[in-house]
Amino acid sequence: VRILLVGPRESGKLKIANYLEKTNSQPLKKVANIMYYRRTILVPDSYLESPWMHKHVIALQQTASCGIFLQPVTAKRHSYPPNFAKVFRIPIYGIVTYHKSYEESALQQAKAQLLACGLEQVDLVLDLEKEELHQIEQIILGRGRENGEF
């Protein structure tokens, strides 16, 4: 399983990638290009912000089993183009991320942004400060991974 991680700044991509890669001793570092790891493909936020780079993100589905679109509650601007998720043939999961706390209006705005990008539902609201990252595995295993292997 290789997961495509896409999200704007402050969405927690690196923290989630570190968890999925199980890199306790040497954490992954932020870089300006696409990084392929054992379990994840990490897309820099600059690829999402630039319309000219969207085609490269779309092409990454060829090497991924599924994708996760992250949306932080703190983001004010629309990160994803309309119906962007509908271009992908692999399963795409929507996750709203936050640190410690959030306002209900900000949460609703983040969910609306994920739905506007073509996702049918928001799969998880995730606190990056708590030890809730295991819920990502449960969502992926729960929707199509019957063999229990991650």
Regions found by a protein language model. Name each.
Residues 1-43:
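Conserved G1/Walker A P-loop phosphate-binding module
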Residues 64-71, 88-99, 112-127:
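Conserved beta-strand/loop subsegment of P-loop NTPase cores
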Residues 102-150:
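Canonical P-loop GTPase G-domain recognition
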Residues 47, 74-76, 99-103, 129-131:
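Conserved nucleotide-binding/hydrolysis micro-motifs of P-loop NTPases
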Residues 18, 80-83, 106-108:
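Short amphipathic alpha-helical segments
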Residues 11, 15, 52, 105, ...:
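Charged, alpha-helix-enriched surfaces in structured cytosolic catalytic cores
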Residues 13, 76-80, 133:
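Short, well-ordered alpha-helical microsegments
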Residues 40-86:
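Switch II of P-loop NTPase G domains
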